[in-house]
């Protein structure tokens, strides 16, 4: 489909296409017209009249066969008739300029096109339909009311009239700050949905982290070797589970090393661990319990169990003595202590689980422990479901609340929050009203940059150049 938009769009179409009945220029909006481009193709043209079109301008959308030659020839003929090739995002930029959508909704168009799963699609649709815009309208309305009261007071300063009690203004600012905090707090989840939930796969060297990544992806993405320290940098891949994208991050094995390159990789492991929403801690179930406990304490000290999901994976189950005999009992899901265990594999696993539970109990939290074999695929599905269930619970907790998914919006909200905090401090310290009012106006400015009520050519250029041509 080729789109032409602008005041001369219908006239340009008439120069290129011979219609069976009448012309584009004489057609009403929301009309389909059949026509022929001589020697090129038969086409179907959708006619839209301003302001009832995507861009808010007169527009035509020409549906033709998808042959590269046909498309190229049509583009050439349209250009010769007076049209100009569109820049990336130009149609959406015109829609924004003509008031068909605000800037946050325009950005949602790009997110919608880029969405690769149900969760990111839902978030983009919510924003496109005005989710964040509605929240910001409420916020700006609150702040405008506060500013109006303060500036009215300034107009009557010589008469010493107080239009708003300071405690009342502080209460109003607290309400606005709380509103902004809810939005900024949603960014971690919103950004994860948009870009893929970050899942760090961490553990000591040679525990099978890269094999686990490859098994989850169903392809050999990371290099697997029996030599410890093979993975020296992070490897990231998107993995979809039940309509949600997860960004799996394979990391360098944690160990003491004199290799400077490997040391940098290990530092990056710790960085990714801090930023992950979920952490898969991988252990070789065949290692001595004391060694495993030491590795576990090291990882646990870097995980925030209040905000991060931790899944313990006891890998290489297929190498356990007596594994095949105990396999049915291990396939039931996450592990717990079994006081009646007699099988060697069960006893070995039970000992590890007991010691790990003692360590976890000191944190007043619970974690999932899964015995699996990344090599054979045993219990891989249980790991996938543990990730999926946790993410679904987070989304359910958010309910119908608006999620901030865009880093630009998050930064603007954070800056507005800082300005309002200064205004609040000013009211508490009896700072002159005009200075406090200036802080609130600054907050309004930054909120306005999100929807485009305040914008610069540089900001608009940065946003729309990321679009594909045709949108």
Region locations from a protein language model:
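A glycine-rich (often HGG/GG-containing) alpha/beta subdomain
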Residues: 1-122, 126, 130, 303-306, ...
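Conserved nucleotide-binding/hydrolysis micro-motifs of P-loop NTPases
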Residues: 6-9, 50-53, 67-69, 101-102, ...
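Switch I (G2) and immediately adjacent beta-strands of P-loop GTPase domains
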Residues: 36-39, 45-48, 230-257
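C-terminal-of-GTPase-core extension/linker across diverse P-loop GTPases
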Residues: 121-240, 257, 275, 286-471
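Terminal RNA-binding accessory module
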Residues: 213, 237-238, 244-247, 270, ...
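Generic enzyme active-site microenvironment
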Residues: 248, 282, 313
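Short, conserved glycine- and acidic-residue-centered signature motifs
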Residues: 262-265, 436
